[in-house]
Structure formats: C-alpha cells, structure tokens
Amino acid sequence: MVSDRFGFGDFQYEVVPDWGISSELGVVSDVATDSNDRVYLAVRNTAHTETPSGVILVLDQHGNLLDSWGQDLFSTPHGIWISKDNKILLADSSDHTVRSYTTDGRLEFTMGTQGKTGESGCPFNRPTRAALSNSGTLFVSDGYGQDRIHKFTGDGDWVMSFGETGKGSGF
C-alpha cells in the first residue's frame, strides 16, 4: 500500500492532490510562507510556457495565484526566506546577490555586487540562502563558491564571515 502521509510523530505531512495553480511550473527552487499564510515560490525558469510571468509566485493557502513579480530581476533564484514581519530575503546564486523585498515585490536593499563574485572569503560567490535571526542578525550561506557563512546586521552591513573549504574527502 502506498501512503500519501510522510514524516514522524508531530511532524507528519499529507499529499494534497490537485493543490495549486499547475503542476507545470518549471523549476521551483524554494518555497516559503509569510505571516498571512501566503505561499511564495521561487521559480528558476520562467521561459517554461506554463509558468505565469514573474519569478516569485504568490499563492493563497488554497494554491490560487494571487500575484507574481520579479520578471527579469533574477538570474538563478536559489533560496527564499520570510521573516515574522514579512521581510523577504532572496539569494540569487548566479547573480551573487542577496536582496530584501516587501511582500509586494518592492526592493529594500541588495547585498553583493550584481554579476560579480566576491574576492576569496568576501561575500558573495553563489549564495544559496539567507535567514534573519530573532535578534535581527542576518546570516547568508555562501556554499557553492565560498564555503562560508556570512553574518550581517539586519540592514545588510557585513559583520564577519566564517568557514572554509574542507580538506577531507567528505561523506
């Protein structure tokens, strides 16, 4: 018997068939929800014919399309994260930037230099995700090219970086 329920204990999830606008969205690289239960999808290939315009698709909790934005703004959206106060952070791994947006797609600030990798140890070289702590500190994983975590103020000012490429063979 095939089950549509996954997980363990209090963390069990069930497949909801036919939820959302289309199963033909293309490459969805990440998903996040805001404090109003809106669902944000980061879509990489907007050339996919069934994908609505916009790189960020905003759905209601039932999967209906509410909004889309970001067309022609991103190279490769990789990670999306939304704070408790609905600040949206989007890491663009090919563009070497992390950007902060409002829920309606208004840019607040950009970290990194668009299209330019940071020097060794400096932000960014293909950032993958950003997250804001409860204390307002911003952390960015820069794993593809830097193998580092960068720490910033909540306004995007760099504080420090840590980590390095490992010397072992891995797992």
Regions found by a protein language model. Give the residues of each.
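Eukaryotic scaffold repeat domains enriched in small/polar residues
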Residues: 1-171
